[in-house]
Amino acid sequence: MVPLRRPRLLLLATLVGCVTPAPAPPPVAQPPPGYTPPPGYAYPPQPYPAPYAQPAPQPVPGPAPAPLPAPQPLPAAPSNRPLLGALVGPQAWQAETRAVLDELKANLSPDKQQLVAGIPLTFDPDPGDVNAFAGCDDQGAPFIAGTEGLLEAIDAIAQTKATDELFGTRTYDAYTAAVTPGLVSSPGARAILPAGIIPAQYWSDPRRISRAHEIFDETVGFTFGHELSHHYLGHTGCAHGQPAGVPPVASDFNRFITSAIPTLNQWNEAAADQAGVNNLLDAGKARSATAYRWNEEGGLWLFDFFARLDGASGSTGIVSFTRTHPNPAIRIPVLQADAAGWRFLHPG
């Protein structure tokens, strides 16, 4: 589960700075410390155009230099990776998340599919809460839930990371510096992307829009794949393959979260991280012939976001989640190791 409600801030509870002037040309955005991106196609960073300069005086002719090697062409987007459209607003985010979750379920082993096939996904429209969790309702039926605040955060991560990857900007740093202080101190704060973080000239670039869509999908894929695994791993104790039930109403979410907290522990969270990323990588491999191949990067950036929140919180309530959940900074290398283990067993 990924709660982040002030003053009680939890991270992925059954899931889960400052802006500095960029030199010209701006540096390429860097991944979390120690992270080596998985192999695969990535858009090359695009430098800003060089300023116009007057031609230099002609040099005195000399011996002709040896010819330089022919430049290597930039990698082209594979034919199976079409440009994707924009995901705008809660309805689009929710529909996309449901589609991703269905794809994850389809790539589970048959025994796990049977346990979770009918589990509903529901959303709390509260934008002030950043949270996702798996639970059981009052009738003992399983469900998975997420909040609008979580989808706002994932969209902002996707929008900024796509921009940085393509254009060498630092919009993710600017975004986290802008929102983390409020999220850990103000009940009215939201994780939505503030206006002006992404430069206007990049906003409508179709490559940026498509890349943001891909990052959104693999981030919600890890997030809700983690939640789904709490059911088929038996952590909730209520997923037995029963027919789909009616998901709980949003007003009951706080009560369900509170009642679930005593059962949460670091072993379950670590197991769900591993199962969730394995499911995501299985689905990514299965779709790679026709679409973008999902990987663990979305989970890594989500953990990085919560690690920055942890750093911004100081002595406030967010630190308390480490009593029942692995520290997000620790989860980054563990998730990397989980993904490396999957690749060792699934070469190619």
Stretch-by-stretch model annotation:
Residues 135-217, 234:
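Active-site scaffold of zinc-dependent metalloenzymes
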Residues 34-55:
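Composition-driven detector of proline- and glycine-rich
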Residues 19-21, 38, 62-143, 147-152, ...:
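C-terminal capping/extension segments of zinc metalloprotease domains
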Residues 215-229:
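Short alpha-helix carrying the canonical HExxH Zn2+-binding catalytic motif
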Residues 1-16:
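Sec-dependent bacterial lipoprotein signal peptides
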Residues 210, 214, 254-261:
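A short, mixed-charge helix-start or loop-turn motif at secondary-structure junctions
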Residues 186-202, 231-258:
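A structural motif
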Residues 18-39:
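Bacterial Sec signal peptide processing site at the extreme N-terminus
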